[in-house]
Amino acid sequence: MPHFCLVASTSMLSASYDVSQDLSSALYTSSSTYKYESASARIDCLSTTCTQVLKTLEIEHKLSMKVFATLFLLAASATAALAAVPAPNAGCSQPGQYCNGGTFLCCNNRQCNNNVRVPYSVPGYARNPSYAFSRHHGRNGSSQLSMSIWDALEELLVSGGDWVSYNQWAKYEAGARVVGTIHERRGMNEID
């Protein structure tokens, strides 16, 4: 996988709070601009560029089981973005299917990313594997914006289900390529 220059901070939050409340405060400022701002991170995604990379978040389970969720936002040209996507796989006949009949999700225009798994426990994903990549999740009248990486993180954290890890998670968000890595284990809903 190509290496990109990323800017990140390892600052941690000191107070516990409900992740769902924090993430739901994200603002869609217009149909072409997605803005998220909180005590943990700040991101401005314009129609062609995503600037500012997320801070590393330390997420702690109620039972003191710690996991780490690290999200990287990449602002890249179409050429660089496509270079980060795995080569097409014959096991994917169409988006939304599973690679080679397994548990890995086919995505990114019929390309097979063997590092992406679908969380079966979340309603919608089990019924429709392409749910995470195609669902529209509009707020404040911006329904034309597709589900953002923030919405995916929000659902991951508040689902309470048993998720497997996401690696090289990639999708288009507001015209820019977003590449992220999420590691989560079970039922996270608090940040320490």
From Swiss-Prot:
Cysteine-cysteine disulfides: 45-106, 50-99, 107-112
Coiled-coil residue windows: none
Keyword 4Fe-4S: no
Key word Coiled coil present: no
Keywords of this entry: Disulfide bond
Induction: Eexpression is low in biofilm, but high in sporulating cultures.
Entry text on domains: Does not have a secretion signal, has an extremely short C3-C4 loop and a very long C-terminal tail (132 residues) after cysteine C8, has an atypical hydrophobicity profile showing a highly hydrophilic C7-C8 region in contrast with class I and class II hydrophobins. Moreover, most importantly, it lacks one cysteine (Cys3 or Cys4, based on the position) of the first of the two CC doublets that define hydrophobins.
Function in brief: Aerial growth, conidiation, and dispersal of filamentous fungi in the environment rely upon a capability of their secreting small amphipathic proteins called hydrophobins (HPBs) with low sequence identity. Class I can self-assemble into an outermost layer of rodlet bundles on aerial cell surfaces, conferring cellular hydrophobicity that supports fungal growth, development and dispersal; whereas Class II form highly ordered films at water-air interfaces through intermolecular interactions but contribute nothing to the rodlet structure.
Family under the similarity heading: Belongs to the fungal hydrophobin family.
Assembly description: Self-assembles to form functional amyloid fibrils called rodlets. Self-assembly into fibrillar rodlets occurs spontaneously at hydrophobic:hydrophilic interfaces and the rodlets further associate laterally to form amphipathic monolayers.
Listed name of the protein: Hydrophobin-like protein rodD
Species for this entry: Aspergillus fumigatus (strain ATCC MYA-4609 / CBS 101355 / FGSC A1100 / Af293)
